[in-house]
Structures are given as structure tokens and as C-alpha cells.
């Protein structure tokens, strides 16, 4: 026989008006914050990934794939030049 942990049952929480008042604001705000994070370009700057227009340059039209594990830094420097 299981004992009580003293916590409110999940069904009580989900059917609570207070729960929905709080979450009807916070859940959409999370989506808006994520959209702003990506649309402003901050995500590209934070994680260091190239923007979609930076994958291919005028001089380099091939896919920048690192093929040699031990000369990876040299290959990445070639891709950036």
C-alpha cells in the first residue's frame, strides 16, 4: 500500500483556474521568446552557427565538410577564407 507524499494530485492542479491563468500567459511567452531569439539572429551569434546566407560564398560553392580529422583546423580555416 502506497503512502501519501502530501502533494496535490495532478488532476487537481490541471483543473485549477489558477493553473490556467498562470500558464495561459507563460506558455505563449515561451514561444514568442523562442521566435524572437531565432528571428533576430541572436541564436546564430550565441551558438556560433552560420546564418543561412553564409553557408556558400561567391568563391566557395561546395559543401564545407571536414574530411581529415587530424587537419580539421586547417580545413576550417580554408573554409573561412
Swiss-Prot record:
PROSITE patterns: CYTOCHROME_B559 (PS00537)
SUPFAM superfamilies: Cytochrome b559 subunits (SSF161045)
Domain of life: Bacteria
Any one GO MF annotation of this record: electron transfer activity
Record-level GO BP terms: photosynthetic electron transport chain
Recorded coiled-coil stretches: none
Residues bound to heme: 23
Pfam families associated with the record: Cytochrom_B559, Cytochrom_B559a
Regions that span the bilayer: 21-35
Cofactor(s) recorded in Swiss-Prot or TrEMBL: heme b
Keyword set, alphabetical order: Electron transport, Heme, Iron, Membrane, Metal-binding, Photosynthesis, Photosystem II, Thylakoid, Transmembrane, Transmembrane helix, Transport
Cofactor note: With its partner (PsbF) binds heme. PSII binds additional chlorophylls, carotenoids and specific lipids.
Membrane topology per record: Single-pass membrane protein
GO cellular component terms attached to this protein's record: photosystem II reaction center; plasma membrane-derived thylakoid membrane
Compartmental location: Cellular thylakoid membrane
Family of the protein in this entry: Belongs to the PsbE/PsbF family.
Functional summary from the UniProt entry: This b-type cytochrome is tightly associated with the reaction center of photosystem II (PSII). PSII is a light-driven water:plastoquinone oxidoreductase that uses light energy to abstract electrons from H(2)O, generating O(2) and a proton gradient subsequently used for ATP formation. It consists of a core antenna complex that captures photons, and an electron transfer chain that converts photonic excitation into a charge separation.
Subunit comment: Heterodimer of an alpha subunit and a beta subunit. PSII is composed of 1 copy each of membrane proteins PsbA, PsbB, PsbC, PsbD, PsbE, PsbF, PsbH, PsbI, PsbJ, PsbK, PsbL, PsbM, PsbT, PsbX, PsbY, PsbZ, Psb30/Ycf12, peripheral proteins PsbO, CyanoQ (PsbQ), PsbU, PsbV and a large number of cofactors. It forms dimeric complexes.
Protein name from the UniProt record: Cytochrome b559 subunit alpha
Naturally occurring in which organism (per UniProt): Picosynechococcus sp. (strain ATCC 27264 / PCC 7002 / PR-6)
Amino acid at each position: 500500500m502506497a503512502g501519501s507524499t502530501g502533494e496535490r494530485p495532478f488532476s487537481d492542479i490541471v483543473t485549477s483556474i489558477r493553473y490556467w491563468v498562470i500558464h495561459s500567459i507563460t506558455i505563449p511567452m515561451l514561444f514568442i521568446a523562442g521566435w524572437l531569439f531565432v528571428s533576430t539572429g541572436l541564436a546564430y551569434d550565441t551558438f556560433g552557427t552560420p546564418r543561412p546566407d553564409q553557408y556558400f560564398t561567391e568563391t566557395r560553392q561546395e559543401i564545407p565538410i571536414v574530411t581529415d580529422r587530424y587537419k580539421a583546423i586547417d580545413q576550417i580555416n580554408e573554409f573561412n577564407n
